[in-house]
A protein has these predicted regions:
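PLP-dependent amino-acid enzyme catalytic core
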Residues: 1-403
Length: 403
């Protein structure tokens, strides 16, 4: 059972393994939304995510005998690092089962804390089932990533810090995967101030908690599909579910495209790397239809591998019309490429890629295709460049960039 005494105890214990992440006021998001927006940067924890709070507190509640049997868990990455780090602090062996789709950065960092990593299954649920098998077979103590009151209590220490620093907070936005973080945060927030509204945020492609709350019972999704790998969960926690039924005020679901935009917003306006699951609460700000409120978005983690980061940046630039491609047909004669380039240069467009296809027509002397990938300042600038090409006699077609 989650109690105020346990939350207070956990707040003191987790200080040994975590740092108190101070709220960051966001001028950018405040102006965008008409609220006072603060960010809770759990991506700044030593392990890169909030998960170490729940892992450390849970392990602290175990007996020495339970710890010495060895610890095992399943995780898409951040809980893995939390358990590995906490186990090392307690001098215990840790075995971590991770889905085969887990980003390499999370796998390597988990190993770096001294844990044994086993890759199994495509999603968390499959990895978890295998971890439970190993626990039974080898006698390990299983540390559940979210469906455990002690783990949820540790995660809830985030709410203690938020309310201590911002006593008059109106809204707290919290990411939801299996529900451990949302359980701890919403339960403690309501204990300390029932007027605080706690909004859960899920990826639209893995909205297991929303489906469960609507059904009035825990349900399992047939599949999940989201770039927010840390919250790609089919089945929410059965033990924590009643707390969320009682304490969660609403749920917002977020499409992947919104996460891509949020990543660019964080990089460009806060110079901060936040992983896709951590960006859920940033993307949700525009769907929170309130004004003049104090809002805290919990950034749950920042463990993103460079390849994923590169892909998200590219997609974000394309989505915002800062990179686009046009196809034009040109007569196959000298000087045509210079003419097109001059039109673009006069509009301050920056060419970053050219693809010249002489075989678009059976008569290559009649026309060749030129695909031009450009960098622009945004939608208005893109339209200006396209219109300039039209005015100079070209018939530009905007096509999907192939970078």
């Amino acid at each position: 059972m989650l109690t105020l005494d346990k939350f207070e105890e956990a707040s003191e214990i987790v200080k040994k393994a975590t740092q108190e992440t101070k709220l960051i006021y966001s001028k950018y998001f405040s102006e965008q939304t008409g609220n006072k927006v603060y960010l809770k940067p759990e991506n700044m924890q030593t392990t890169g995510a909030y998960k170490v709070r729940g892992a450390y507190y849970k392990i602290s509640t175990l007996s020495e005998e339970e710890r010495q049997k060895g610890l095992i868990t399943a995780s898409a990455g951040n809980h893995a690092q939390g358990v590995a780090y906490a186990a090392k602090e307690f001098g215990a062996k840790a075995v971590i089962v991770m889905p085969t789709t887990t980003p390499l950065i999370k796998v390597n960092r988990t190993k770096g804390y001294g844990a044994e990593v086993v890759l199994y299954g495509d999603v968390y649920d499959e990895a978890c089932a295998y971890a439970l098998e190993l626990a039974e077979k080898e006698g390990y103590t299983f540390i559940h990533p979210f469906d455990d009151p002690a783990v949820a209590t540790g995660q809830g220490t985030i709410a203690m810090e938020i309310i201590k620093e911002l006593p008059l907070v109106d809204y707290i936005l919290v990411p939801i995967g299996g529900g451990g973080l949302a359980t701890g945060v919403s339960t403690l927030a309501k204990m300390l101030n029932p007027n605080i509204r706690v909004i859960g945020v899920e990826p639209a492609g893995a909205a297991c908690m929303k489906a469960s709350l609507q059904a009035g019972e825990v349900v399992t999704l047939p599949n999940v599909n989201t770039i927010a790998d840390g919250t790609a969960v089919k089945t929410p926690g059965k033990n924590v579910f009643p707390y969320l039924q009682k304490n969660l005020d609403d749920i917002i679901t977020i499409e992947d495209d919104d996460l891509i935009v949020a990543f660019l917003d964080m990089v460009e306006n806060h110079k901060m790397i936040v992983e896709n699951s951590g960006l859920l609460t940033v993307a949700a700000l525009k769907y929170l239809h309130v004004k003049d409120k104090k809002v805290v978005s919990i950034l749950s983690g920042g463990n993103m591998d460079v390849i994923t980061m590169s892909s998200v940046v590219q997609l974000g630039l394309i989505q915002r019309d800062r990179i686009f491609t046009v196809s034009v047909l040109l007569p196959d004669k000298a000087g045509e490429l210079v003419r097109v380039a001059t039109v673009i240069a006069n509009e301050q467009g920056n060419v970053i890629k050219l693809d010249h296809n002489q075989f678009v027509s059976t008569n290559r002397n009649a026309a060749v295709e030129l695909k031009i990938t450009l960098e622009a300042f945004g939608t208005d600038h893109k339209e200006r460049i396209v219109n300039a090409l039209k005015e100079h006699g070209y018939n530009p077609k905007v096509i999907r960039p192939n970078l």
